[in-house]
From Swiss-Prot:
This is V-type proton ATPase 16 kDa proteolipid subunit c. It is found in: Cytoplasmic vesicle, Clathrin-coated vesicle membrane; Cytoplasmic vesicle, Secretory vesicle, Synaptic vesicle membrane. GO terms for cellular component: clathrin-coated vesicle membrane; membrane; synaptic vesicle membrane; vacuolar proton-transporting V-type ATPase, V0 domain. It holds the Pfam family ATP-synt_C. It comes from the Eukaryota. It comes from Bos taurus (Bovine). The gene is ATP6V0C. The lineage of its organism: Eukaryota, Metazoa, Chordata, Craniata, Vertebrata. Ubiquitinated by RNF182, leading to its degradation via the ubiquitin-proteasome pathway. It is a multi-pass membrane protein. GO terms for molecular function: proton-transporting ATPase activity, rotational mechanism. Expressed in brain (at protein level).
Length: 155
């Protein structure tokens, strides 16, 4: 009888998995984006060391992806309690997977665009604006996942 009111004992497992998925997948995307963009910056800085600070933008944008996952993971962790329902814990799992997997995809996109964009900007500075626009569109992919995750986790 208490199971219907509070949910089964294993219900919190799914919410914890949602928090873990949010952090792990978004951090993987951010790490890939940082590493891929960072190698492009390192290669470019040999030829054009004066452009290092201008080229750091993809690395910063990749790091923001991890912050999205952190926000959702903290929201999920703060909403955990002993009597969480199975419905609520599945919502938390969905929220974590939403922000995590969209962060992974956004991190991959930011890394690839950042690497090619930084190398191209070193040779042709007019490519900088185009690189920034493409990076913004890649970052928005992670933002969409964050919005869906916030809607799910606060439901």
């Amino acid at each position: 009888m208490s199971e219907a009111k509070n949910g089964p004992e294993y219900a919190s497992f799914f919410a914890v998995m949602g928090a873990s998925a949010a952090m792990v997948f978004s951090a993987l995307g951010a790490a890939y984006g940082t590493a891929k963009s960072g190698t492009g910056i390192a290669a470019m800085s040999v030829m054009r060391p004066e452009m290092i600070m201008k080229s750091i933008i993809p690395v910063v944008m990749a790091g923001i992806i991890a912050i999205y996952g952190l926000v959702v993971a903290v929201l999920i962790a703060n909403s955990l309690n002993d009597g969480i329902s199975l419905y609520r814990s599945f919502l938390q799992l969905g929220a974590g997977l939403s922000v995590g997997l969209s962060g992974l995809a956004a991190g991959f996109a930011i890394g690839i665009v950042g690497d090619a964009g930084v190398r191209g900007t070193a040779q042709q500075p007019r490519l900088f604006v185009g690189m920034i626009l493409i990076l913004i569109f890649a970052e928005v992919l992670g933002l969409y996942g964050l919005i869906v995750a916030l809607i799910l986790s606060t439901k």
